[in-house]
C-alpha cells in the first residue's frame, strides 16, 4: 500500500491545530472499545456465575410438594394441611406417560452430626439412588446410595463437603468412619463435593444423605414424604405433564380440581429458560451500548477528516489565487 506523505502531514497538522477535538475523539474511540470489551466480559462473567449456581441440576426436572388447601372440597375445610406419600409416587409413575423417572425425598433440618470431639449442624436427607440423575452429587470419594442400601435400610451415609471439613482433619479419608447423627451411628460410604448454592432442601455441602428407607425408620416418618422429584422424557416439557401430575394427586387427597394453591411445583426447566432469555436480552443491550459508543467515536473521527478536507480545500484555494 502506497503511503501519501503529504496527506499524512496534512492530517498531522490538522490534529495538532485541533488538539482538544482530537483528544476527545481519541478518548471516545478508546472508551467505546473499552466499554464494549468490559460489558461483554462482565455479561459473560455474570452468566457463568449464574450457571454455577444451577450446576448439576437436570434441566427437565420438576419438584412437587404440598401446601394448605385453598378451597373447601367434599366435606374438607379450606386451609387443610395434607401430605404426599409413597403411594403418590407409584400413582404418578404408572399413570403419567411423560415421566422419565420419579423419586421421593425427605429431609430434616437442624440435626447434629458428631465425629469424635467435633460437631456440625447439618441437614439430613433421605434419598433414593435415582435422585442423582436429578441433582448431581459429584462424588469424589466412595459411592452414592445404591439399591441394596435401600432394600436393607443400611445405616450408611454420604456426607457433604462442609460436613467433611467440619468433622475431619484435612487429608483424612472419611470412608468407613462412623459419624453420629441425632444419636444414631452411620458409616460414611461417600463424599459429595457438589458446590451449587441453589439446592433442593438445603445445600448439598451441608447435608448428610441417608438411604430413604433408613431415614424413614430412624425418624419414624411412616409413608409420608416431603417432595416428589421427577424428570420428563426427551422432547417433553415439565409444563406438558404438570396438569396430569396435579390431577392425580388432587384426586387421591380429596383436593378440589380448581384449587391453585394446594400443590406447589418448582419447574427448573422454566427457570433455565427464563435465565437464558434474560442473558440473551443482556447480550443484545451490551452490543447496542458498545456499538453506540464506538459509533460516537467514529463520528468524531469523521469530523476530524472533514476538518482536514475543508482546511485542505481552503489552502489550495489560497494558493491558486496567489498564483493568479
Task: Show which residues each predicted segment covers.
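Alpha-helical transmembrane segments of integral membrane proteins
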Residues: 25-35, 283-303
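Peri-transmembrane interface segments
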Residues: 50, 229, 242, 256-290
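Conserved small/polar residues in nucleotide/adenosyl-binding loops
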Residues: 313-322
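Mid-to-C-terminal secondary-structure elements
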Residues: 125, 129-145, 149, 154-256
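Short, strongly hydrophobic transmembrane alpha-helices
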Residues: 20-48
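Hydrophobic, regular-secondary-structure patches
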Residues: 44-123, 130-133, 166, 216-217, ...
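N-terminal Sec/SRP start-transfer signal
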Residues: 1-31
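Structural beta->alpha junctions
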Residues: 71-82, 114-119, 191-196, 221, ...
